């Protein structure tokens, strides 16, 4: 699904069927084995290769992509984390996300804190994360590749 088509579809839903978007916002994915697919979906949506956000040392300009990818994962697998920042991230998310991004738990924990803070502070960041999460959920629902 290309992003232009997706944006038209989202505009149509927002204008004509806002209740559908509200119900999508309440969906979360219980299968944590799909975390790598969410990361792949984020990279596809952002138009970047996954190697850009993987590894201990990445370019400073790519760090925002890592934070956004982590925020999308949290939005899909543990959305309550964004309503209460004191909620602990599920240990199974750490176990899946760390190897997927090829980073240790310390860097992952700091990245999660940064992603949550940006989600809390910046409206544009929050809107983009919700948009990408909705893109994944819709794409996963209609394309059984995910």
Spans of features found by a protein language model:
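Residue-level detector of well-ordered alpha-helical segments, enriched
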Residues: 34, 38, 66-69, 107
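Short, solvent-exposed secondary-structure capping/transition elements
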Residues: 79-87, 108-109, 118-125
């Amino acid at each position: 699904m290309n992003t232009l088509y997706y944006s038209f579809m989202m505009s149509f839903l927002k204008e004509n069927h806002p209740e559908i978007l509200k119900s999508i916002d309440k969906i979360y994915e219980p299968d944590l084995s799909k975390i790598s697919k969410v990361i792949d979906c984020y990279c596809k949506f952002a138009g970047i290769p996954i190697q850009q956000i993987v590894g201990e040392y990445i370019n400073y300009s790519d760090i925002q992509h890592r934070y956004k990818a982590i925020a999308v994962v949290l939005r899909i697998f543990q959305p309550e984390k964004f309503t209460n920042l004191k909620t602990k991230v599920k240990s199974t998310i750490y176990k899946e996300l760390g190897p997927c991004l090829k980073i240790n738990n310390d860097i992952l924990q700091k990245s999660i804190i940064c992603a949550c803070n940006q989600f809390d502070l910046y409206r544009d960041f929050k809107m983009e994360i919700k948009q990408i999460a909705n893109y994944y959920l819709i794409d996963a629902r209609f394309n059984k590749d995910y």
